[in-house]
Amino acid sequence: PPIRVFGTVGFICSMWAVDLGGMQENAGQFAFSGVLSLLLAAYALTLPACPVSHAAERKSVVEALGLRAFTLFRQKRMALFFIFSMCLGICLQITNGFASPFIFSFGGIPEYADTFGVQHANILISISQISETFCILLIPFFLGRFGIKRVMLIAMLAWVFRFGFFALGNPGSGVWLFVLSMLVYGVAFDFFNVSGSLFVDKETDISIRS
């Protein structure tokens, strides 16, 4: 969990650096990302070796490539889980890729051009990751109280509110709806990812987990 949390903290710091460094609307953000990637690559070389465990028995090509995991689609509950996972994955990429341009687009409207949301869209969006960090702490309680399936349903419903609040908000008088959308993101992302991981761990054989 600490590694997972600090990954999100790094995400937040990068968003703030891009925003405050004036790189939101230019190629500077790619150069910044490239430099960070090189630094992380250099750091990775200092990590201890993690040798792969070589099993005594010989494996077929199918097993070696992990293709046996596709047999899980024969199970109705796993097939449904994978389908919903892909759908929510699409939602995640939409919100990651288009949240900032959507807020920036309000800059073309004089009423919103000088608002904090338009000027600092990345900082506003980073509330999503801040919420994500804190929502991780709620998961043990919700899993114990409601179980894996209900927690997954809560996450799916949260995605509806995430996009609903986002669609209704604006950087001016409706910025509170944007903030609500960011706060709900923590539930939408964390609850499904963690409960989904537990579900897969519970339903699959150890030989095909990843």
Where are these regions (language model features)?
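Hydrophobic core of transmembrane alpha-helices in multi-pass small-molecule transporters
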Residues: 1, 86-87, 162, 176-191
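Helix-to-loop junctions at the C-terminal end of transmembrane segments
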Residues: 21-23, 134-148
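Symmetry-related core transmembrane helices of the 12-TM Major Facilitator Superfamily/SLC fold
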Residues: 29-46
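Juxtamembrane intracellular "pre-TM" segments in multi-pass secondary transporters
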Residues: 48-83, 108-110
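Pair of pore-lining "gating" transmembrane helices in MFS-fold secondary transporters
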Residues: 74-95, 183
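Short amphipathic helix-loop junctions that connect adjacent transmembrane helices
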Residues: 97-120
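C-terminal ends and interior cores of transmembrane alpha-helices
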Residues: 157-172
